[in-house]
Amino acid sequence: MTKSAKIGVLLANLGTPDSPTPKSISRYLWQFLTDPRVVDLPRCKWYPLLKAIILPLRSKRIAKNYQAIWTEQGSPLLAISRQQKDALQAYLDTQNINAQVEIAMTYGNPSIQSTVKNLLKNQVERIIVLPLYPQYSSSTTGAVFDAFANALKEERGLVPFDFIHSYHIDENYINALANSIKVRLKSDEFLLFSYHGIPLRYEKMGDYYREHCKQTTIAVVNKLGLTENQWGMTFQSRFGREEWLQPYTDKFLESAATQNIQKIAVICPGFSVDCLETIEEIDKENRENFLTNGGQSYQYIPALNVEHTHIEMMGKLILEKLA
């Protein structure tokens, strides 16, 4: 491959409904919840339950939450992802890299399949896939890999590709997180690292997501010079009745005041883009949860989104693959 060869860069994230309506959300959730990487229950049991009970009820409830955060540009996740794409494209241009940067979603639009087709149509000679999940999990990064592999199955010619597995202790990522926290965290605030949870059963089956979360947290804590009583780590967004990774974020915040934690700042290092889970669940629902249970002040520290340190980190991950 020559130095001027065109590179396709695929920024992958979870996805979003096309609109904040129950019908659109139901269609999106069907894609999401029928992926065996996400829910591995037998189809004969899971699908009827999903169709008859879960989708009708959950779609209506979630629609209200999406409507509360929807923008003229669509969902925050999609709008910010587009900004990330443009910013990364500009960064790679300054590095004289002949690249076409695209965003793609595991569920919803733009799909990974359609994005890969578009890149190949534009004759890229190599694709670099960057799942925007710093910490590997089979239910997120693994699902991106499946979707990307399925997209390539339709092609007779297999384009060379690189798949960035994780970047949970990448120096530029840790520095970006630490800098974002440093300019916002007050000296009397307890810092809570909240990560999206996964079923405990998945960990027992070999998913090492929790360990990646721990390594990220410890690296940031060391960078900031925090003591043991100044921070904690929890897991959010559990779904269903089975046990997930603990401690649970909502339960921790309910009882934090009884542990003499009156002022708190929450950051979600696993989210590269602010979305429903951070804006609605963490910044709104859990704020109310903490304050109504004796807390005095609550701060949500936003995702890295389009901060220049975040875009530069992405760019350097790409450049490392091209070295």
Swiss-Prot record:
Reactions catalysed according to its record: heme b + 2 H(+) = protoporphyrin IX + Fe(2+)
EC nos: 4.98.1.1
Subcellular location(s) of the protein: Cytoplasm
A GO cellular component annotation in the UniProt record: cytoplasm
UniProt pathway: Porphyrin-containing compound metabolism; protoheme biosynthesis; protoheme from protoporphyrin-IX: step 1/1
Record function comment: Catalyzes the ferrous insertion into protoporphyrin IX.
Name by which UniProt lists this protein: Ferrochelatase
The organism of origin for this protein: Haemophilus influenzae (strain 86-028NP)
Gene: hemH
